[in-house]
Amino acid sequence: MAHIRKATGVWDWFDQRLAVTKFFKVMVSEYWIPKNISFLWAMGVILMTLFIVLFVSGLMLVMYYKPDVNLAFDSVNFTIMKEVEYGWLWRHIHAVSASVVFLILYIHTLVAIYYRSYKQGREMIWVSGMLLFIIFSAEAFSGYMLPWGQMSYWAAMVITNLFGGIPIVGDAIVEWIRGDYAVSDPTLTRFFMLHVCLLPLVVVAVLAVHFYSLRFPHVNNLDGEEIDFELEGEKYLQGKTSESKVIPFWPGFLAKDFFYVSIFMIFFFYLVGFHFDFAMDPINFEPANSLKTPTHIYPEWYFLWEYEILRGFYFDVGPLKAADIGLIAFAFAGVSLFFIPLFDRSSVVAPAHKNKAFFIWFWVLVIDMILLSLFGKLPADGAELGIENKYWGFALSIIYIGLLVVVLPLITIAERKRV
């Protein structure tokens, strides 16, 4: 039995029972961060800030939202926007943060790829981070359906129909997800439950795993230098702060991050106040109508590159229909970044600019994803530069898959042989 002495204060009382001092040291005050980093390392704290903003603004909105197909549209566009005091502000904050969180997620992910922060013991950091991306995607989609506008309804119809492509059990899965034969009231209430209850809990759990996985291999640095964190941490604790290559997570690292978060929040509230419309589709201000299909159905900007891969395969191959090939490619695109640690066959942990081939590969990947997003917003039957959009989509989709499955293994195998 543990020896419990009389506590000298509240902190000491908890410390004897929960070891809060030791926990604080391991997770915060003696968790060491390399000095050799830039503002790009602040993206994680910005993401955490946005998650809190989403949670608080979501709480304010859910007080007045009605998860009923006859009431949902009016509860958002009339009750919240016109009758609830500052309801418009909470909706704008929630919509903008839901969109901007993906911008920061993409930056965070691309920085990790550029500096190759997914190998040499950091694989679980990468996997848990990509799992967070998938869960945030599900959270975003379930939330997009709740206003019950035209694009909400038809996006739900298209996305749930995708599961119908699964052999044998596809139709049963679609009906199970919807709770009905068509997108209707049971579908709305199910997605409401996912958005406000289940998925946020999963996000919190995976966030905890992500933060915990950071504590052992520690974060990477600008040069990919291998640092003895225990030795450098001892130097810091001995007062040799200038000699040490590390700083503590608190106050050293977070104090700098608070500055970057402050700058970001200025940009964020500028969007909330003056350009909130970028996060809201005009078509979604029309009530859902199952008898009126929008001229062009497309997802939010952060899913456009995957959507273009889905529709990029416009031809049949033997027994495989175009829709089936597109669905397979779409499924691959959704999980492809999970496997970058496997596709990268080199043991070198160094930024992209130290390997010319990897540097070129990285920027071609970024440009390809941007182009996929641009064409994903355009109608498939249109044409750009005299070439039909479907051909552009197919070419860009093949380039994306080839960059990951073929090019990345080849250039990293060549790098491994040079080392």
Placement of each model-derived feature along the sequence:
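Membrane-embedded and interfacial regions of multi-pass energy-transducing membrane proteins
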Residues: 2-100, 104-419
